[in-house]
Amino acid sequence: MPFTPIKLEAFGSREDLYDAAASVLVGALTTAVARHGRVGFAATGGTTPAPVYDRMATMTAPWDKVTVTLTDERFVPATDASSNEGLVRRHLLVGEAAKASFAPLFFDGVSHDESARKAEAGVNAATPFGVVLLGVGPDGHFASLFPGNPMLDQGLDLATDRSVLAVPPSDPAPDLPRLSLTLAALTRTDLIVLLVTGAAKKALLDGDVDPALPVAAILKQDRAKVRILWAE
């Protein structure tokens, strides 16, 4: 089913992109707290958002009324270098933003599937999200919903009652077990921000997006507004 392409918002430099993204995210959280009293922030991992989180951590917002969680996570403890929780704790949950609560996806001492089930209570309590921040992979994945993965269909099903899924490794990705919020959970918000850099991702998202790509499900849903912020 065709859908109207979302215009990409381009910035002249990555520094400008990071500044703008931080402002958009903190503004959305502040507005949502005024409306709902308490909200969540679903934060993505990876290298691109770290400078955005550094900026957000210095900004004034009603952080004590915000619960931060993750769009997805590797099934590793926060002390692991690849942990998204570790990234968020180092870059966002410091300074002003240290007042925010945190709802993890990974739980130690339980199985992969049990961790996903256990995470759902915290994620559900964090909704509605004031804003959701997502990256997009070169294969069109978002969160840890990868093309060809056995959990993709359930992850994209807006009617599922699951908020968090245990995503197994698959070929070619992911290489490690993951935990991922579902599209149904990620759209419990007024605003989803896609933060992307580089020519390849611009080509992926600019204009008509291949409907077979997982990210197409984000762009064609009508529950939440989507903004795409990009810089080379």
Curated annotation (Swiss-Prot):
Listed EC numbers: 3.1.1.31
Q: Please name the source species.
A: Caulobacter vibrioides (strain ATCC 19089 / CIP 103742 / CB 15)
Q: Which reaction does it catalyse?
A: 6-phospho-D-glucono-1,5-lactone + H2O = 6-phospho-D-gluconate + H(+)
Q: Which CDD domains match?
A: 6PGL
Q: Which pathway does UniProt place it in?
A: Carbohydrate degradation; pentose phosphate pathway; D-ribulose 5-phosphate from D-glucose 6-phosphate (oxidative stage): step 2/3
Q: Which InterPro entries match?
A: 6-phosphogluconolactonase_DevB (IPR005900), Glc/Gal-6P_isomerase (IPR006148), NagB/RpiA_transferase-like (IPR037171), PGLS (IPR039104)
Q: Which PANTHER family match?
A: 6-PHOSPHOGLUCONOLACTONASE
* Record's function text: Hydrolysis of 6-phosphogluconolactone to 6-phosphogluconate.
Q: Could you tell me which cysteines form disulfide bridges?
A: none
Name under which the protein is recorded = 6-phosphogluconolactonase
- One MF annotation (Gene Ontology) recorded for this entry: 6-phosphogluconolactonase activity
Gene (UniProt): pgl
Gene Ontology BP terms:
carbohydrate metabolic process; pentose-phosphate shunt
